[in-house]
Amino acid sequence: RDFHADNIMVKNKTLGIIDSQDAIKGNLLYDVASLVDDVRIKTNNNFKTSLLKYYLTKTKKIKEKEYVMAKQDLSILSIQRNLKILGIFVRLYKRDGKINYLKFLPHTWKLIELRMNNEIFNNLKKLLDYAVPKKNRNKMNFNAN
């Protein structure tokens, strides 16, 4: 749940992970989604695709020939994760006064929109466009309760 670039450290040319107390078993692509669509780090689409393909060639759990399905799973997980992050960041602002998380909201919306390029998300797109119109997604007005 908390796997992202800030929790990966390099020591003596070896990768290590910190802050792993919330680790749980789940979909194999959840951590990949967390890395390629990290709301705090902007990466280009080539990097995202390369990382997914690299992961698929290194793991024995998912075959590279299942790339299309893996890419769809990655989109589902990324959208779910980033919608949750939107809620968490707004809650941290409203409840705790932590304004610094608000700067990540526009990029989080961009990541969600990027991943909704599959027809399976058509209804979700309509719902989000109704609930939070695109013109309002970069505004920082959270005064309504």
PLM regions and their residue ranges:
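ATP/Mg2+ or Mg2+-diphosphate-binding catalytic cores
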Residues: 87-145
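Glycan-recognition and catalytic cores of secretory/periplasmic carbohydrate-active enzymes
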Residues: 5, 10, 25-26, 49-53, ...
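Active-site acidic catalytic loop and adjacent metal/ATP-binding pocket
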Residues: 1-32, 42-46
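Histidine/acidic-rich helix-loop-helix segments that form or flank divalent-metal centers
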Residues: 64-72
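A short, ordered amphipathic alpha-helix with a cationic face
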Residues: 22-24, 79, 98-102
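Active-site activation/catalytic loop segments of kinase-like enzymes and analogous catalytic loops
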Residues: 28-63, 76-96, 108-116
